[in-house]
Amino acid sequence: MPDVPPPPLTAVPDTAELANLADDYAALRDGVGVVDLPRDFLRVAGPDARSFLQGQLSQQVDVPVGTSAWSLLLHPQGKVVALLRLNRTGDEEYILDFDGGWAPTVVERLNRFKLRVKAGIEVVEGWRCLAVRGPGAHEAAPGGAPADWPGFPGVDLIGPAGEVEPPAGVRACSPAAYEVARIEAGVPVMGRELDESVIPAEAGIVDVSVSFTKGCYTGQELVARIDSRGGNVPRRLRGIVVLGVTLPPEGAVVHAGDKDVGVLTSVAWSARLGAPVALGYVRRAVEPPAEVELRWDGGSVAARVLALPLVS
C-alpha cells in the first residue's frame, strides 16, 4: 500500500492536539520547519538514460548535473502516472523521487516503454527526504532541491539516510502539521489528488512540470491539445473551507444547486482559518468563490469553494 499523508481526521482536534500542532504549523508557515517525508527513489543510469527519459517525461531532462526539475510521467492517453522530481546526478545518471509507495507503479510504467534501451532502472533503498518548509527554508538549507509551491516555499534534502540530516536549529515538525499546510497550499499528492483518472491541467501542475519546447514524449498529445485550447478542462482542483466546525470525510460529495459537482480528496483542520479545509475536484461550472454543500452518508455541511492557495 503506497504511503500517503496522515489518515483522514474523523473529528476536530481537541485543545491539546491543537496546541501540539500550533508551533509546528507556525514554523512551516511563518518561519522554517523540517518534516521527514516518505518518498521513493529510482536510479535510471546508462548510455541511453538521457534519451530514454527525454521520451518518457514531460519535462526537459537536459538539466545540469547537480540540479533538478519537476516532471510528470504519463500514460499514453495523457493521464497521470506520477508527479516526480528529476535529479541529474551524472552525465548518464538520474535519480527520480516521488511520493512514497509508488515505486512499483513507476517502474512498471517505465519498463513498458524500455525497448532496446541501454539504461538500467532500479529502486534505491535507504534514502530519505527531509522537507524544509517556510519563508526561511532556502536560507536554512541552501543546497536543497527546490520544492517551492505558491504560498508554501521550501527545499528538500535528499540522499542516503545516514548522510541527510536536518539543518541546524530548524524545528522538527509533525506530518500532521505539514498536512494542514499542504492542503492550504493546494499541493497534490499521489493516491489522493493524483491518480490515473487525472488530467495534469485539472490538478494545476502543468506550469511546474511540463516543457512545451521539448520534443515528443509519451502522453504529450493530450497535454498539448488542452494547452492550445486555453487549458480548459471539465474540473479543477480547488480549495474548500467549511462554514462551521463539522469535519467532512474524504470522499464527501460537493453539491451545488441540484447537482453533484465534485468530491473531496483531502481534509484537515486549519487553526489559522478556524475551520476544516479540504482539497477537491470541482466542475468548472462552479467558479470560485462559490457556496456549496458537502454531503456524505449521515451528514452534510455548508462550505465555500475558493481558488488556491487558501493561505499565502
PLM feature spans:
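Acidic, proline/glycine-enriched N-terminal capping motif
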Residues: 1-81, 90
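Glycine-rich, small/acidic residue-mixed loop/short-helix segments
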Residues: 2-5, 84, 198, 206-210, ...
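Short amphipathic beta-strand starts and helix->beta connectors
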Residues: 21-30, 73-83, 114-117, 138-145, ...
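Acidic, low-complexity central loop/insert segments
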Residues: 33-34, 40-41, 82-189
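Residue-level signal for inorganic ion chemistry
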Residues: 46, 96, 134, 157, ...
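Short, conserved charged micro-motifs
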Residues: 48-53, 103-107, 137-140, 161-168, ...
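Short, intrinsically disordered, mixed-charge
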Residues: 54-62, 108-116, 228, 256-259
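Anionic-ligand-binding alpha/beta catalytic cores of soluble enzymes and soluble regulatory domains
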Residues: 158-237, 241
